[in-house]
């Protein structure tokens, strides 16, 4: 269960994986994009997981329709704004939204730097209108290769003060982290935090690589850490967090079933592991589902679920002062200061 006196966070949430089906339909019409269906219910199976996908790449294809309708920078601004509204409606007190500007730009050949600026504009307007706190993590989509990732990084660096961290996502098996060491050196030089998708499609060596070569402070998914006790000890001792996404890992067939998910073991190993959504619109779930349905099925006790909720703020990419201010704000709103 969710502890209402603690801030509720989602620190692994893809902006470009959370484009509303209704918005896809409307933007598709606006920008003359031929979609696989003309009404909402017929479109839904194409843009939302209805059964578990055979692998990560198949799952990621569900995201493609969402970005296919981003026909202008205004469209990017709109979906960013709607992401903030969705986060607030989900009950989140704090979220880190991650996005790949190259992925969002490529279908309509939008300027990548312009996409970054449009997303920032949409998030800023949303935070103002809905009185919430959202931070942005830039993604390099490794699937498109090192050169495209450098374009993406350059665009993100042009707004370096509005981005809190850099991530690497996409085809983990085909494009290992070692190819991107220079990119992450630039990110660290810019003062950014580092989180990396690793140990989702590949083994624990991918997580080691993210930590030792790329400087990862947090690992996205990280499920294969469970087969390397030395790695788990290293992560626990060094406070390297795991951004767990329970339902997502089942839908991508990364983990066979929730009762076999390693999150509970990570928590018992004292790794600062957290509960997150991943791509809510594509998955057809929200953060409450992860806490109230997925976590118990994954074997977490109420105490362990609360610990994961605490971890979400503890390893967030904001200052200790900002974390304390958020705790106090939640207590004022839902309890007693």
Swiss-Prot record:
How is the cofactor bound here?
Binds 1 zinc ion per subunit.
| Coiled-coil regions listed | none
For this protein, the Enzyme Commission number is 3.5.4.4
Q: Where does Zn(2+) bind?
A: 12, 14, 197, 278
Question: Binding of substrate: at which residues?
Answer: 14, 16, 170, 279
The family database entries (InterPro entries) matched by this protein are listed as: A_deaminase (IPR028893), A_deaminase_dom (IPR001365), Ado/ade_deaminase (IPR006330), Metal_Hydrolase (IPR032466)
Which top-level enzyme class is recorded in the Swiss-Prot or TrEMBL entry?
hydrolase
Q: Which Pfam families match?
A: A_deaminase
**Catalytic residues, chain numbering:** 200
Work out whether the entry's keyword set contains Transmembrane: no
- Which cofactors must be present for this protein to function? Zn(2+)
**MF term (GO), any:** zinc ion binding
Show which residues form the site (Important for catalytic activity): 221
Catalytic reaction equation(s): adenosine + H2O + H(+) = inosine + NH4(+); 2'-deoxyadenosine + H2O + H(+) = 2'-deoxyinosine + NH4(+)
Tell me, which GO biological process terms does this entry list? adenosine catabolic process; hypoxanthine salvage; inosine biosynthetic process; nucleotide metabolic process; purine ribonucleoside monophosphate biosynthetic process
Q: Which UniProt keywords apply?
A: Hydrolase, Metal-binding, Nucleotide metabolism, Zinc
Q: Which GO terms describe its cellular component?
A: cytosol
Q: Which family does it belong to?
A: Belongs to the metallo-dependent hydrolases superfamily. Adenosine and AMP deaminases family. Adenosine deaminase subfamily.
Known role: Catalyzes the hydrolytic deamination of adenosine and 2-deoxyadenosine.
Its name, as the record gives it, is Adenosine deaminase
The gene it comes from is add
């Amino acid at each position: 269960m969710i502890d209402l006196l603690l801030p509720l966070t989602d620190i692994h949430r893809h902006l470009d994986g959370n484009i509303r089906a209704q918005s896809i339909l409307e933007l598709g019409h606006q920008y003359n994009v031929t979609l696989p269906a003309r009404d909402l219910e017929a479109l839904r199976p194409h843009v939302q997981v209805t059964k578990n996908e055979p692998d990560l790449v198949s799952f990621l294809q569900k995201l493609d329709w969402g970005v296919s309708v981003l026909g202008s920078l205004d469209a990017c601004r709109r979906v960013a704004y709607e992401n903030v509204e969705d986060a607030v409606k989900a009950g989140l007190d704090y979220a880190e939204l991650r996005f790949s500007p190259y992925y969002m730009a490529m279908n309509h050949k939008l300027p990548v730097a312009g996409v970054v600026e449009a997303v920032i504009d949409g998030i800023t307007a949303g935070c103002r209108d809905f009185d919430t706190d959202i931070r942005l993590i830039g993604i390099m989509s490794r699937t498109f290769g090192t050169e495209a990732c450098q374009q993406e990084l350059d665009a993100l660096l042009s707004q370096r003060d509005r981005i809190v961290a850099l991530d690497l996502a996409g085809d983990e098996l085909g494009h290992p982290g070692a190819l991107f060491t220079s990119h992450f050196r630039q990110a660290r030089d810019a003062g950014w935090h580092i989180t990396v998708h690793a140990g989702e499609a590949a083994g624990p060596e991918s997580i080691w690589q993210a930590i030792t070569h790329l400087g990862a402070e947090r690992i996205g998914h990280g499920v294969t850490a469970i087969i390397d006790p030395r790695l788990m000890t290293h992560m626990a001792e060094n406070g390297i967090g795991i951004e767990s996404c329970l339902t997502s890992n089942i839908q991508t067939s990364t983990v066979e079933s929730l009762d076999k998910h390693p999150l509970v073991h990570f928590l018992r190993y004292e790794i600062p592991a957290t509960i997150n959504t991943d791509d809510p619109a594509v998955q057809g779930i929200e953060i409450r589902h992860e806490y109230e349905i997925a976590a118990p099925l994954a074997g977490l006790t109420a105490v362990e679920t609360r610990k994961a909720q605490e971890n979400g703020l503890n390893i967030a990419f904001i200052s200790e002062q900002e974390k304390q201010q958020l705790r106090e704000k939640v207590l004022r709103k839902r309890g007693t200061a």
